[in-house]
Structure formats: structure tokens, C-alpha cells
């Protein structure tokens, strides 16, 4: 009888442990993608009420000059203090053209040094992690991976973790040399097509990508989902460009401006698909991005759904 009782207690403890594990909340994070760090009242409120614990802040881009030189561009300035109790992850965007340039063996050292100098200059906390964002391709993979391996070694010497973005199409390649990755679950379609209603996020496209990829991807992943929209100008059915402001592009009679924006339901569908493919990817949910327009489109419960669904 005692043995049976012990067995029952052990089973109950195991069951409780499994249920507890399933209920662990996801880490909540946001991207901040602007040239000026200045938090509005609505942004501060969003960070607080949505319990955001990490901010991936774009520090600068690395671009190619006409002579092939790699240069920093669009460096962020800080007009607001960084929020307390929120972890800062400096993020650097590198254009794929940079990876086409031979040489530049000191790029990793330059990026790390500049990032740490910016943190010191703006009285920001020493980062525990930095992230590199690059839309690398098969032709630039070898050079990009060599750069990451060098940066990872330099970062580890300063107790800094290295993460890198992973686009869906990049899952076909071996995992890059980094400590972790962020799977970008967006930009699944062609923005230039008039008949493409869901170019930012189509859950069916996500399912198609992931159904052909083994979940045993050799890198710890987080998942990033889109809450942004695009206003796209078409002349007939011909793509003209994205309207970042009303007067950015000339609009003539007969033109059409369409808004492409993922619905909350589409985001939740995509999140479910990622969950079935690799559940641990949703242990950290990141939204792109923390612009005031993006965080005021829906009511509070809609964003809560994305984080807690």
C-alpha cells in the first residue's frame, strides 16, 4: 500500500512539473528601429504594461561606399534615458553588399569597439548580448560566417553573447556561428506584387518554409513577429514604392495606395506554426517594432494575446 502511495505521489509530482513547465511565460521583447532613441509616453506605457524585459536597439548600419569601403551609417542618438529593468541588446544591421567585399578582416573588431564606445558615451549598461542583422545569401555565407566566428570570439572575451537574425529562407543553410539566433517570422511575400495581399506575413508561407526544415536546427532560437504595416503605392498594378510619409512619392490620378498589415489572427496562426515546429523558439517572443504607430493600432489585449498565446 505504501509503495502504491509513493508511486501515485511521484506521478502527481511529475504531472505537476510538466504542467508547470508548459505554463512558463515567454520572455517579452521588442525591437527599436529608429535613428533617435526617444521614448514617448505611449511607448513607456507599453513597455511597462506589457512587461517588456528586453529591447533590441538598432545602433547603426554598416554600408558599402562607392569605393568599396565599409562605413557605419544612420547611427542612433539617445534623447531619452534607457528604461530601468529592461535589458539592452545593441543591434547592428549589415548590408549584404558588405559581405561581397574582400578583405575587411578587422570588421568584427571595429563593430565591437564602436558598440561598446557608444554604450559608454551614452551611459548605457554594458551589454550582455549584441546582435548582428544581415540578409546574407548563399554567395556571401562563407564570408559572413567567418565574420561572425571572429566577432563571437572577441565578444566572449568580454563576456558578451552573440546573436544573429535568421530569415526563413536562411534555414536551408547550416546554422551560423553564434550563441543564439532570432527567427524573423515576417517578410514572407513580395511587396512589389499588387495581387499579394499578405506580403509581410502569410502564415501559410511560414508553414511551407518550416515543413521542409528539421526542427533540430543547431542553434538556440527566439522568434520575432511583425506588428508593423506598409503603405504601398501602385500605378495600375505596377509597384512604385513604399509611402513612409504622404508626400514621399508623387501620387497621380489613378494611382492606388494600399495598406499591407498583418492581422492579429495571422500573427497567432504563425506563432502556432512555429510552436509546432520548434516550441522553444517561442520562449522569447519579440515584436517588430516599438514605434508609436505600431503599438497603438490595437488594444492592449491584442498585444497581450501575441505574447501569451
Model-derived features with residue positions:
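Substrate-binding surface in catalytic domains of secreted glycosidases
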Residues: 146-235
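Sec-dependent signal peptide recognition
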Residues: 3-9
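A structural motif corresponding to the C-terminal end of an alpha-helix
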Residues: 82-85, 118-125, 154-155, 208-221, ...
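Conserved, mostly hydrophobic/aromatic
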Residues: 55, 132, 181, 223, ...
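Substrate-binding cleft of secreted/luminal carbohydrate-active enzymes
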Residues: 228, 236-309
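Catalytic domains of carbohydrate-active enzymes, especially glycoside hydrolases
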Residues: 40-64, 121-123
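C-terminal motif of bacterial Sec signal peptides marking the signal peptidase cleavage site
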Residues: 16-17
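Chitinase-like catalytic core of GlcNAc-active glycosidases
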Residues: 23-32, 62-183
Amino acid at each position: 500500500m505504501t509503495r502504491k502511495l509513493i508511486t501515485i505521489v511521484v506521478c502527481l509530482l511529475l504531472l505537476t512539473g510538466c504542467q508547470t513547465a508548459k505554463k512558463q511565460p515567454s520572455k517579452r521583447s521588442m525591437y527599436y528601429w529608429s535613428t533617435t532613441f526617444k521614448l514617448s509616453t505611449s511607448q513607456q506605457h507599453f513597455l511597462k504594461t506589457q512587461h517588456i524585459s528586453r529591447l533590441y536597439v538598432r545602433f547603426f548600419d554598416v554600408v558599402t561606399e562607392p569605393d568599396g569601403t565599409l562605413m557605419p551609417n544612420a547611427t542612433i542618438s539617445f534623447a531619452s534615458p534607457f528604461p530601468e529593468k529592461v535589458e539592452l541588446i545593441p543591434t547592428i544591421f549589415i548590408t549584404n553588399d558588405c559581405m561581397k567585399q574582400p578583405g575587411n578582416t578587422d570588421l568584427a573588431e571595429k563593430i565591437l569597439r564602436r558598440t561598446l564606445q557608444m554604450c559608454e558615451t551614452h551611459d548605457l549598461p554594458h551589454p550582455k548580448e549584441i546582435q548582428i542583422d544581415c540578409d546574407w545569401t548563399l554567395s556571401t555565407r562563407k564570408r559572413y560566417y567567418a565574420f561572425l566566428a571572429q566577432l563571437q570570439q572577441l565578444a566572449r572575451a568580454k563576456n558578451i553573447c552573440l546573436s544573429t537574425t535568421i530569415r526563413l529562407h536562411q534555414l536551408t543553410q547550416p546554422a551560423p556561428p553564434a550563441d543564439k539566433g532570432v527567427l524573423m517570422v515576417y517578410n514572407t511575400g513580395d511587396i512589389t506584387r499588387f495581387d499579394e495581399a499578405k506580403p509581410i506575413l502569410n502564415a501559410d508561407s511560414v508553414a511551407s518554409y518550416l515543413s521542409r526544415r528539421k526542427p533540430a536546427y543547431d542553434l538556440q532560437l527566439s522568434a520575432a513577429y511583425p506588428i508593423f504595416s506598409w503603405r504601398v503605392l501602385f500605378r495600375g498594378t505596377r509597384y512604385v514604392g513604399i509611402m513612409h510619409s504622404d508626400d514621399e512619392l508623387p501620387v497621380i490620378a489613378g494611382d492606388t495606395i494600399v495598406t499591407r498589415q498583418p492581422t492579429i489572427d495571422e500573427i497567432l496562426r504563425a506563432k502556432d506554426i512555429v510552436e509546432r515546429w520548434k516550441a522553444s523558439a517561442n520562449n522569447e517572443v519579440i515584436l517588430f517594432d516599438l514605434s508609436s504607430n505600431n503599438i497603438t493600432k490595437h488594444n492592449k489585449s491584442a498585444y497581450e494575446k501575441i505574447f501569451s498565446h
